[in-house]
Amino acid sequence: MTKALVVYGTRYGATANTSEAIADVLRKEGFEVRVVNAKEDKVQSISEYELIIVGSGIKMGRWTKEPEKFLEKFQKELAKKKLALFVCCGAAHPLTEEEEKTREMEDARRKYLEEKAAKYDLNPVALGLFGGVYDFNKMSWFFRKTMSAVKPKLEEAGFKETEAGLYDTRDLNAIRSWAKEVAKMVDSQT
């Protein structure tokens, strides 16, 4: 049985839920999976895992620090493993004019995934750019004020509040499809 490790960092919970959705798919595909919140559980070794997936939420253009530290700590070993990276962020569903959306998504993929892999000299088998969660209830007063202009744009784009102050822009079917593709890639290479 192929062993997989999913390590993530989250601010509002979207990346945690996304990591669990990815793990569920991998388990159905026959993988033995361990899911780790990098803030709560420090991974000591990755030697037993054939596949490692690292994910982060994005806020103010930055990864959460814990998965970044994981990439740094295990950089040499990750370069020899089957690795996939993903982020959950608003840039996966830009709230701009149609002609801007593709460019913004390409910019996000480059900045948050390709440049992150290059920074640590990694060659992932897959990169995933997924929507995120806007949880106005958990945001600081300043950030909530800054993001207040986003609420009407979310609704214009078809994203409704799933709970008071909570907008989820993730596409769980796309996330599951991505995880299934990662599983197929890893299976075909083993």
Q: Which ranges hold each PLM region?
A:
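Alpha-helix C-terminal capping/helix-to-coil transition sites in glycosyltransferase folds
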Residues: 47-48
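N-terminal beta1-alpha1 ligand-phosphate binding loop
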Residues: 2-31
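Short, glycine/serine-rich, charged loops/turns that create anion-binding
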Residues: 11-12, 40, 90, 134
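A short glycine-rich beta-strand->turn/loop micro-motif centered on a GG-aromatic cluster
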Residues: 32-42
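FMN-binding flavodoxin-like domain, especially the glycine-rich phosphate-binding loop
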Residues: 29, 34, 51, 59-190
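A generic structural signal for ordered secondary structure
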Residues: 1-5, 36, 183
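Short, well-ordered alpha-helical microsegments
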Residues: 42-43, 63
